[in-house]
Amino acid sequence: MINSLLTRVFGSRNERQLRQLNRIVAKINALEPEIEKLSDEQLQAKTPEFKQRIADGEALDKVLPEAFAVCREAGRRVLGMRHYDVQLIGGMVLHLGKIAEMRTGEGKTLVATLPVYLNALEGKGVHVVTVNDYLARRDAAQMGKLYNWLGLSVGVVYPGMPHSDKREAYAADITYGTNNEFGFDYLRDNMALSKADRYQRGLHYAIVDEVDSILIDEARTPLIISGPADDSPELYIRVNRVVPHLVKQEAEDGEGDFWVDEKGKQVHLSEAGMEHAEQLLVEAGILNGETEGLYAAQNLTVVHHLNAALRAHAIYQRDVDYIVRDGEVVIVDEFTGRTLAGRRWSDGLHQAVEAKEGVPVQRENQTLASITFQNLFRMYKKLSGMTGTADTEAFEFQSIYGLEVVVIPTNRPTIRKDSPDQVFLNRKGKFNAVLADIEECAKRGQPVLVGTTSIETSEMLSEHLSKAGVKHEVLNAKQHDREATIVANAGRPGAVTIATNMAGRGTDIVLGGSLEAELHALGEDATDEQKAAVKADWQKRHEAVKAAGGLHIVGTERHESRRIDNQLRGRSGRQGDPGSSRFYLALEDNLLRVFGGERVQKMMRMMGMKEEDVIEDRLVTRMIEKSQRKVEAHNFDIRKNLLDFDDVNNDQRKVIYAQRDELLDAESVKDNVDGIRDDVIFDVVARFVPPNSIDEQWDLRGLEATLESDFGLQMSLTDLVKEHEELDAEAIAAKVQERVNQHFAEKEASVGEETMRALEKHVMLTVLDQSWKEHLARMDYLRQGIYLRGYAQKQPKQEYKKEAFELFSDMLENVKREVVTLLSRVRIRSDEEVQALEAAERQQAEARLSQSQFQHQDVGGYSADEEAAQVQAAQQGVAQMQRDEPKIGRNDPCPCGSGKKYKHCHGQLS
């Protein structure tokens, strides 16, 4: 009651904001007479003037009134369109990083030119995001005339563009493109092997057209780049034939070619084993024995395959670790004994086991990179959006994206008549009424737009209209070019257009048809008389349609979201035109059935209601809207729930991508490698010779074997300790560290500093990328089963955060170990070899991308809704939480032993 009273006195927040913006509109209007007097050259000179003022530190908000006035005058001169006052308000809302709700026909495309022009003056790039390629190209071509006239460059990005053209488009002041293309290019940039391979120059400011469609409707499913793994199935088979000839050692120092670390599930080749394996691989034709060895740089893939094959033969046993069923290797869960259908071991192990068992070696499709639109667009420093329907989702925009919705008043009052819903007993009665309404409108020359929720319904209606002899168009949303043409002509007298609810957005339905399209069809050589004749003919049609009642909207079913229904209604009544709308429903429709439609249907039949009888009451409409609100709230919970999970992945993605950027930008990564090497060697030594331990606790032979197998170092630590009995654990660690550093220094001296720097950078990038891809697969597996923790009285989200952090920490440690191991063992003779290696890697990366699938779909073959429902169901089973361990205070020492406070270490994930 108090809120209502305050609103009546001071106005709503929306009204207060509009009052503030109207004051700035008055300033812009006051500048108009002065700006109008400027010559074209003087007006164009304003752009470099503004740029200089901004470069000198003047805020954009200070430049805004003058910049908007210049853009408005340029629009009048170049496009023949002058921005209305309400369009100036819309432009300011977009500049402020908010969402402008503007009704259909209010000129959103023209509105965007104001904030785009102003923000492009900073020189950091502005992205204008549309829902399809056709609209991106159309808007870039139309509005590009204005921007180019004002001295700004415009680019448009679309799938399949040449690399140089796309880089140029992103380097422009203003770049148009679809949400998918901006997202995929962001992912591609974070798979690039050099700075020159990247497209984008940072995510600075974006204006999202149809923002509700992109940030809400498409928010639940991620963009995924997936492709076949690099491994060749043939190479697995060839290497598999070599492994049976290698002999297993009974002990670490025994005779043979390799020994097995049962606990770590690893296999290590001895020095003799390396020579024997190299000989066998040469005999098999896999290696060229005259010019290359097993650990030559170009043979790292062969080493990877050999290790996988050794593990498959020596560690993984049939009918224990896996079974063979229907020609496939199926993993057996070591704890439950159940088969894990659909799961595959990573790192090439599964293919190696398939080769061992003689079943077809499958080439995996691996997720190379993924991101959700929620996380993509939240990375922009400033984000804004436009749509005709955002107010119903204002809470979600605010809570997830921090975007406030401002409803912009229409330039002219809306006079469209929205009739109450008509509810029928069943679908047959409903569609009979729909067909009768369409035929009646067609007879009196009133255009009709029929909105359906499925292609099946569209085709059924089309069939009935054809039988009745009613001419009509069915809009296929897959053909964007044709879609725009059909929608542009949907306002002609008597036109009947059947479309799915979302089709045709971005193109206005003009009463009488599109005059602009007709004039364009005349061609550039058309005379003034021809143009005048076309305009006169259009004017007659325009008046005829207005007299018939304007565009009539027929909705054949209520959508789950009120916003989608409002979008359909909003196609009619643009710019103060007449229009009407009505929804026809049946108690069998999905929305009504879920909320008790079947029960009501039985009751109505008992009361004698017939098929052709209709319920028409405002109360019914309100009840339906109440049902829609319930569904909207449920869908919001799903999206919010999924975002909580995605945020964990996103935090990790940011760390990895930041590390990649640092590597790509760095001239040298020597300091990074030196630091990593020290950490890795310290950890390796500590495993066999623990700090502050006595010599009885040392495993010097194990340390020697590991240094030899992993780092190619031969050190007789046993003899060293015998000679120097005073050596303690710290001294041994120092000796090993000294020897490793000497080994790296010798390698650098033999190949040259420049070659070594290039190799270090290449190895770090390659290992990081490969580890990240494998980590994504592990995260997918974790996520698919995490909801089951709810049945064990644990919170799935907290469990996911905890285990994801552990997986990520393990991955980072493995990256360090792998980098040092590869750099220790790789043999490089010249700079040309490194360049050849980088060229081969780049070629492989390009091949991966060319074979990749660019998807906007659900991950893992199950829907996002199902996953969220499973999580929610599991969480409902969570009773009062019982801790497995005592609670750790935020200022207590972290139990991991790092010495840091819990809040600064693992507590950061809480």
UniProtKB/Swiss-Prot annotation:
PANTHER family: CHLOROPLAST PROTEIN-TRANSPORTING ATPASE, SECA INNER MEMBRANE COMPONENT OF SEC PROTEIN SECRETION SYSTEM. May bind 1 zinc ion per subunit. It is a peripheral membrane protein. This is Protein translocase subunit SecA. Belongs to the SecA family. Part of the Sec protein translocase complex. Interacts with the SecYEG preprotein conducting channel. Has a central role in coupling the hydrolysis of ATP to the transfer of proteins into and across the cell membrane, serving both as a receptor for the preprotein-SecB complex and as an ATP-driven molecular motor driving the stepwise translocation of polypeptide chains across the membrane. InterPro entries: Helicase_ATP-bd (IPR014001), Helicase_C-like (IPR001650), P-loop_NTPase (IPR027417), SEC_C_motif (IPR004027), SecA (IPR000185), SecA_CS (IPR020937), SecA_DEAD (IPR011115), SecA_motor_DEAD (IPR014018).
